[in-house]
Amino acid sequence: MGILGLSKLIADLAPQAIRESEMKHFFGRKVAIDASMCLYQFLIAVRSEGAQLATVNGDPTSHLMGMFYRTIRLLDNGIKPVYVFDGKPPDLKSGELAKRAERREEAEKALKAATDAGDDAGIEKFNRRLVRVTKEHAKEAKELLTLMGVPYVDAPCEAEAQCAALVKAGKVYATATEDMDALTFGSTKLLRYLTYSEARKMPVKEFSYDKLLEGLSINSREFIDLCILLGCDYCESIKGIGPKRAIELINNYRDIETILDNLDSSKYTVPENWNYKVARELFIEPEVANAESIDLKWVEPDEEGLVKFLCGDRQFSEERVRNGAKKLMKSKQAQTQVRLDSFFKTLPSTPNATNAAKRKAEEAKKSANNKKAKTSGGVGGRGRRPK
């Protein structure tokens, strides 16, 4: 689910935190990608360039086709991806998972009705809702990535949290996912639409964590409370409080405890046994592997291994797989080129640091104006007559 309404709230109130770019803008960047999100996107694909998307036994292969060609495209554009796979979901997520199971049951009933009625559009719609990423899909994807020479990380818990940890440790530039809660976990950069197909022509949308905090006039702790009010995977939200009201409450009271002390109980009903404090701690201290100790290596692909894995029962074209392997090799050789800014260490900015920089800039500007005034308009000066 991510965070309900967060993307629009940022677009409305902190538009400076969002930048749209072409994929090539991220040349030379290392990016942590939410693998489960990618696999889901690939599994719901009906076709990919006219190729078969199933084995001879009818098992889906669209996740492998998507992973193979989309990863090649990223590397072609000079991006070095590392895929992060989900581990065991936190206990707090059980409520959200139960809701998903209910929606799945409803989709199964709706699919049966659509099938009985011969409703092709309905059949496609509800089939998509029944798609889920299994352990087998993830296992196959990891095997493929190993053969491609692309690293992956097994997160102990939530992939978005692990991606954010890699970003904060300076191992990668950004998190690539469609789930906005990567920002709640503290990822300083979030990329959306990075793994979308080229045919969709969607520019990559980059969110800056520091700029959104500045634009919303809140700090990181207050941002977490805002996300809980908006609605997250780990606890219920207060019914009736939408995005606009949520940011107003945070700006006025700064935390959920003070909001609850001042909330109009005749208008809003707080969920019984609301475990927002546990959800908050999960965002502050998520279960992640030590990012500092994770060694990311991009190595040469195993062409023969790829042919053996993807062709045969999985029915991939050997010619296309070999062409893909050659592209991987070419991109590996081109990785000696680096971004100019990679030679400089960028210190993480904070709202306080940003405000201090603004004040310094304003003072410098004022000082320069004063000097200019003295030079051009002082006694005995031969300044220009104002036009």
UniProtKB/Swiss-Prot annotation:
SUPFAM superfamilies linked: 5' to 3' exonuclease, C-terminal subdomain (SSF47807), PIN domain-like (SSF88723)
Entry cofactors: Mg(2+)
Enzyme class: hydrolase
InterPro entries (alphabetical): 5-3_exonuclease_C_sf (IPR036279), Flap_endonuc (IPR023426), HhH2 (IPR008918), PIN-like_dom_sf (IPR029060), XPG-I_dom (IPR006086), XPG/Rad2 (IPR006084), XPG_CS (IPR019974), XPG_DNA_repair_N (IPR006085)
Protein task: Structure-specific nuclease with 5'-flap endonuclease and 5'-3' exonuclease activities involved in DNA replication and repair. During DNA replication, cleaves the 5'-overhanging flap structure that is generated by displacement synthesis when DNA polymerase encounters the 5'-end of a downstream Okazaki fragment. It enters the flap from the 5'-end and then tracks to cleave the flap base, leaving a nick for ligation. Also involved in the long patch base excision repair (LP-BER) pathway, by cleaving within the apurinic/apyrimidinic (AP) site-terminated flap.
One GO cellular component, as annotated: nucleoplasm
The protein, known as: Flap endonuclease 1
Statement: the UniProt record of this protein carries the keyword Nucleus: yes
Annotated family: Belongs to the XPG/RAD2 endonuclease family. FEN1 subfamily.
Residues annotated to bind Mg(2+) 2: D179, D181, D233
Entry binding sites for DNA: R47, R70, E158, G231, D233
Binding residue positions for Mg(2+) 1: D34, D86, E158, E160
Enzyme Commission number, as recorded: 3.1.-.-
Compartments in which it is found: Nucleus, Nucleolus; Nucleus, Nucleoplasm; Mitochondrion
Main location: nucleus
Post-translational modification summary for this protein: Phosphorylated. Phosphorylation upon DNA damage induces relocalization to the nuclear plasma.
Keyword RNA-binding: no
Region named Disordered: 346-387
UniProt GO MF annotations: 5'-3' exonuclease activity; 5'-flap endonuclease activity; DNA binding; magnesium ion binding; manganese ion binding; RNA-DNA hybrid ribonuclease activity
Span list, region N-domain: 1-104
PROSITE patterns recorded: XPG_1, XPG_2
GO biological process, one term: base-excision repair
